[in-house]
């Protein structure tokens, strides 16, 4: 299977400790087009800095990307992370990192495979995420949906109804709004290596779902779409979080 990364994606970074005005200025000085806006769900051709009432801390914000594409998109994201570091941006347990993956061409089979695969991998993914992201009101799991209920869903709307509202680890409501699928589980971070690995993990998961599903009780070492480097990365993340 070809896992070359040329897919469209988007990212939402929740964080605090830098005023939106200062962050916007530093981003612009680094060649990143950004606008400070009120809370909204509109996809823009630029980065946007919006407020988010669910966050705790001083100078909280959500930085939302435009549509990014493949490796070039990751390079732009890396520049943004350099600026976040410059501005001493911080995260805490109230912050998440949300990733949107383009879902415009998905068949129903792909949607079912994706939901089943994430559900089957949830115990593994939970172990390389902090406890605050395991059963959080804003990113609830898929354990309440039986495999049979996922398999018998005939439309995206039906599948969405069975999973529930947008506050789940896999959010299907994003499809009607943006023609994407949103993954909400990752903890807040300003670390590019973490972001890159998670975006690529999701890209590969989605690519794999176009052909099949990951079986229940699959161990990290047996995830069919990960290469040895990513398996090692997440093995070490798991080890660190269990220490």
Each language-model region and where it sits:
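C-terminal accessory/tail domains of diverse enzymes
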Residues: 1-90, 104-243
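C-terminal substrate-recognition regions of SAM-dependent nucleic acid methyltransferases
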Residues: 96
């Amino acid at each position: 299977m070809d896992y070359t990364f040329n897919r469209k994606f988007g990212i939402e970074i929740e964080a605090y400790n830098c005023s939106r005005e200062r962050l916007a200025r530093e981003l612009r000085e680094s060649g990143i087009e950004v606008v400070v806006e009120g809370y909204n769900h509109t996809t823009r051709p630029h980065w946007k800095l919006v407020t988010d009432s669910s966050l705790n801390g001083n100078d909280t914000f959500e930085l939302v990307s435009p549509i990014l594409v493949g490796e070039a998109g990751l390079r732009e994201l890396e520049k943004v992370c350099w600026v976040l570091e410059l501005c001493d941006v911080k995260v805490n347990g109230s912050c998440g990192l949300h990733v949107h993956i383009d879902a415009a061409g998905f068949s129903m089979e792909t949607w079912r495979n994706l939901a089943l695969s994430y559900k089957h991998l949830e115990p593994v993914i939970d172990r390389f995420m902090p406890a605050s992201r395991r059963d959080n009101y804003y990113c609830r799991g898929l354990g309440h949906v039986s495999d049979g209920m996922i398999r018998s869903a005939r439309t995206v709307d039906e599948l969405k109804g069975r999973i529930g509202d947008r506050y789940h680890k896999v959010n299907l409501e994003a499809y009607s709004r943006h023609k994407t699928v949103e993954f909400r589980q990752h903890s807040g971070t300003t670390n590019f290596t973490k972001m890159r690995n998670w975006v690529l993990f999701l890209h590969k998961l989605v690519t794999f779902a176009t052909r099949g599903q990951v079986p229940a009780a699959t161990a990290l070492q047996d995830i069919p779409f990960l290469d040895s480097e990513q398996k090692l990365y997440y093995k070490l993340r798991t080890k660190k979080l269990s220490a």
